[in-house]
Swiss-Prot record:
Encoding gene (name): metAS
Protein name per the record: Homoserine O-succinyltransferase
Marked site: Important for substrate specificity: S192
Pfam families: HTS
CDD domains xref list: GATase1_HTS
Length: 314
């Protein structure tokens, strides 16, 4: 949460230059508090598992967050009970008229599928466009980053010949970036994808700010200059056993998957894995909620579309 200080205190200017948020008294007297509204577009097959992971991350904040769940594929799910979807999920038509402080679009197991072959691809594009006037800040995870780069910048997907799976080391590129507040200079995060996110290509084809990269996994964290689209190419929300579950699933399917790197002790899948990314995962979501959602959004959720003027990315 921000600290409140007198308007003319020298610290206000100094801390502001360091991107540390302070609230001046003149602003504080005009601020009221309301719950943040966050929409989660859940594209993962095991929706309940993903819900738990994301809500665990969102709950690690002093801010009250009200969550709506969204689905766009109305086909019967093989991994989530239909009753659960009917009881807890909205269709897009039910939320189209709403405004949200934040939105999260999850990954999806579609890394080797062309965008035009994805059944709900037109709806994905529509929701991304809709968010410009209805959402303060949108967080894209893994496959959703590919989708957003295509929808916003026309970037075609790049893929690895072999699935990138494991826990990779990253380095931060900006000491004062609020999204990385509290991060170590080097940190680890899980990845599970075929998608390739080459920093040189992203710099050449977008105006995104890149905040963290990995020599092995490529770009990890980036955002638009207005903070309204945030791109996370990994899975900081994953539980300790999620990568193991994916590995065992692929083994059972006869796919001969690679062993997730830096995950099992001694690289032995017979040994229980350990979570080494948990603290940075929580920090990332807390920082996003605080600096990119709470600090930027309007007090009246009805005013969100009026406050922001969308500009087409260059």
């Amino acid at each position: 949460m921000p600290i409140k200080i007198p308007d003319q205190l020298p610290a206000a200017e100094v801390l502001g230059q360091e991107n540390i948020f302070v609230m001046t008294e003149s602003r504080a007297v005009t601020q009221n508090i309301r719950p943040l509204r966050v929409l989660i577009l859940n594209l993962m097959p095991k929706k309940i598992e993903t819900e738990i992971q994301l809500m665990r991350m969102l709950s690690n904040s002093p801010l009250q967050v009200d969550v709506d769940l969204l689905r766009i594929d109305d086909r019967e799910s093989k991994n989530t009970p239909q009753a659960h979807l009917e009881n807890f999920y909205h269709d897009f038509e039910q939320v189209r008229g709403n405004n949200y402080d934040g939105m999260i679009i999850t990954g999806a197991p579609l890394g080797l599928v062309e965008f035009e072959e994805v059944v709900y691809w037109p709806r994905i594009v529509e929701i991304i466009e809709w968010s410009h006037q209805h959402v303060t800040s949108t967080l894209f995870l893994c496959w959703a980053v590919q989708a957003a780069l295509k929808a916003l910048y026309g970037m075609e997907k790049q893929t690895h010949g072999e699935k990138l799976s494991g826990v990779y080391r990253h380095h931060r590129l900006d000491e004062n970036e609020p999204l990385l507040r509290g991060f170590d200079d080097e940190f680890v995060a899980p990845h599970s994808r075929y998608a390739a996110f080459d920093g040189d290509l992203i710099r050449a084809h977008t105006d995104l700010q890149i905040f963290a990269e990995s020599e092995e996994a490529g770009v990890y964290l980036a955002a638009t200059k207005d903070c309204r689209q945030v791109f996370v190419t990994g899975h900081p929300e994953y539980d300790v056993l999620t990568l193991d579950g994916e590995y065992q699933r692929d083994l059972a399917a006869g796919l001969d998957p690679v062993i997730p790197v830096n995950y099992y002790p001694n690289n032995d899948p017979a040994l229980p894995p350990r979570a080494s990314w948990r603290s940075h995962g929580h920090l990332l979501f807390s920082n996003w909620l605080n600096y990119y959602v709470y600090q930027l959004t309007s007090y009246r959720v009805e005013d969100i579309g009026k406050v922001f003027t969308y500009q087409q990315p260059k």
